[in-house]
């Protein structure tokens, strides 16, 4: 009983190719992501909040579109607001909620929402506090699996993971 998991940016051409590569697999988790951080919105994308949210929801729609072409596979989804810890908390929730609205998860077919500390920017308790807040405030929470993804830039990933787990 094996499930393949793949990671892909919210870029239509890459999403299409990812589904082609997974064709024939019985079970696949497609983990799609886009950066939502203040810095990357300004410097990398030169885009506002609505434009960044649209990248995420367009990615979710493209995933569903490609999945429909491969009905023999049991598809599941995971979404990451990349650089979550550099993103305003309320905005990260807004983007995750918009993605979950498109994916329409259920308790029996949940969406995984991965919350990465892509760059560790604060102490582990700050990350844990954000996990607790997201856990309490995400829409469709009964149909969401929260995934913690601390990085170890400052040497505190284990502490961030443990505190985040306790918090959410």
Can you annotate each of these PLM segments?
Residues 12-144, 160-162, 166-167:
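Alpha/beta enzyme core
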Residues 1-12:
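N-terminal capping/small domains of soluble enzymes
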Residues 150-156:
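Active-site-adjacent loop and "lid" segments of alpha/beta metabolic enzymes
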Residues 7, 31-35, 149:
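Short beta-strand segments
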